[in-house]
Amino acid sequence: MNGSQDTAPLDPDIFPLLLFHYNNYMPMEESSDVDEPDHDNEQDADDASYKSDGDDEPEEAEKSHRVESAEEANDSLFLYSINTMQEPQCRGLDDLESHFYWVTPQGWLLMRHHDSRETFLGNPSTRERISLPSGQGDFLEENTTRCLLSHAPTDPNCVVLVINCRDTVLWYCSPAAGAQWFEHRYESWRLDESHSVVVGDMRRLTTFGGVFYADLFHTVVKLQFSPHPTFTVTPVGVRSLPLHSCTDFQLLESCGELFRVSFGQQCFVDELLHVGVERLDVAHMAWVKVHTLGDRVFLVNSRYFGASLSAQVAGLKPNCIYFLRRGDKGLYIYNMERGTTTLHNPGRHLQDDVAAEILLIPAA
């Protein structure tokens, strides 16, 4: 988003996108999951059968590296359109090479220039920029953080939140105020008795109605800014789950309700066994199983990201979950009606263990 003439806006019709970037010091790009055990439980979901169009074997990806030359950098950036299932003809986002950046579930990119430290929110579709304070310290130059927005950045109530994915600390600022970043350290024991569970699940925050939510399995944590950060912990009912497998959960908002998607696998075996969806029944504060998404589609990066879109608007298959797995270049599509999962190879030239980011188009 450096405003250069050779970097054109991306065509909205090619979104959503997979963004592969070999040399970028990407936030959370397969940072090790130290102190973050999987939940030793499994959702009661339909078995997923697999059809593969590539010979992709999931592996733990290596941490990506900083770019060493402009020529090498240009070859390291690869876009893949999820709705057309092919590489788009247009070239864009080359200016990512000179920035640290974080992809938000709202489609905006939090960006920070390597040299000038200029910091802003960038719209990859329109090239619009919204300036942010540069901040103190190195928290905007680390790959162990992620970013979310409470509202659209043009909303005066918008809070830009940066979460540390290895410690109980967060940073936040307001684009409207624009004065400075604030640091807040919170005590994990106030949210859960397990420090590692808190750190691991807080990185999977989602936004709903201007409030941030985290799923700690037996509780839902609500984080509000009024104007200072305030946590509220609410117990929720859960079904008893088998103990023979490990499950990752991703929280997301869809049509004004909270959902969580579960990905279950046999412990110590990198083979996906189950995909399930639950909705939070607010009246009874309990998770209930969902059998259909209707005309919606969920996009999930199982490491920390979830979003819901209209299938018709996005040009995707309705009642499906499009998801990425840790350390795996593959794009997986789970069909809720059939209970089957299809694996798509976005590029045979891509290394198998280079995971992508999901890039959405910001709402108008």
Tell me the role of every PLM-derived stretch:
Residues 1-110:
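A non-catalytic, helix-rich entry segment at domain boundaries
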Residues 21-22, 81, 113, 262, ...:
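Pocket-edge structural micro-motifs
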Residues 72, 94-268:
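A sequence/structural signal of beta-propeller blade repeats
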Residues 72-84, 169-179, 272-285, 331-340:
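Beta-propeller blade signature
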Residues 86, 128, 257, 286-288, ...:
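Residue-level signal for well-ordered, solvent-exposed loop/turn and beta-edge residues enriched
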Residues 88-95, 132-134, 183-186, 234-238, ...:
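Short amphipathic beta-strand/extended segments with alternating polar/hydrophobic composition
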Residues 103, 139-155, 261, 276-279, ...:
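A surface-exposed beta-alpha-beta supersecondary segment
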